[in-house]
């Protein structure tokens, strides 16, 4: 389990915050025509990476490890169904992701002058983006774990794509500096839309002009994250296995 691996816990909670501080400290210039620094934009977007880290990466690794050591095979001997197993895993991830979000929000507010939502609508948006992002990334983590033979191989197939997606999704660098083909690739995956949703409530309203569509596109964020959640669940139910023997 995640909480039984201290090194994994430490890496999960520290890495997004450390990367946020480093990148935010490097990119300090304000965006043209605004008073908001590039560091603030990165800090707001980094919440998406935090969720990806606690859900997709850690579930992919921990489930592959449990399968490799026989933990899932033993669990199969209980009344637990695959669906209830998924629900339990996502609930655990939600708690960890919430703690990660609190840490990143604290860094953003204290170091990069982010402002928490000032109205119920902003908090509502922050909440549903968080929930849908957690669910979609968790299900993708469960799905990808089926293609890893152990924790080591799972670390490779989860961390590799995750790092690449940060660059094309506007978390490590602002979207305004990315070429069109990178924007197209990033728009396929959940991380880009999660980051956009978080920026919409943590940055000043006028920052919307720096989004590719010139709009926060809340409706599209909802549709994309919901689609990935539904697709992820279907994929998990189709390929999930309790042991390496099937």
Predicted regions and their residues:
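Short hydrophobic, aromatic-rich alpha-helical segments embedded in or entering the lipid bilayer
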Residues: 173-211, 219
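Hydrophobic alpha-helical transmembrane segments of multi-pass membrane transport/permease proteins
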Residues: 3-30, 39-58, 98-100, 160-166, ...
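Short helix-capping/hinge motifs at transmembrane helix termini and TM-loop junctions
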Residues: 23-32, 108-120, 148-149, 173-178, ...
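Alpha-helical transmembrane segments of multi-pass membrane transporters/translocases
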Residues: 200-246
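Short amphipathic alpha-helical coupling elements at transmembrane boundaries
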Residues: 1, 73-77, 149, 183, ...
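Alpha-helical transmembrane segments and their short interhelical loops
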Residues: 82, 86-165, 218-222, 226, ...
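Residue-level signature of transmembrane alpha-helical entry/exit and packing/kink sites
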Residues: 8, 12, 16, 37-46, ...
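Transmembrane helix boundary and interhelical loop/hinge segments in multi-pass membrane proteins
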Residues: 2, 6, 55-80, 90
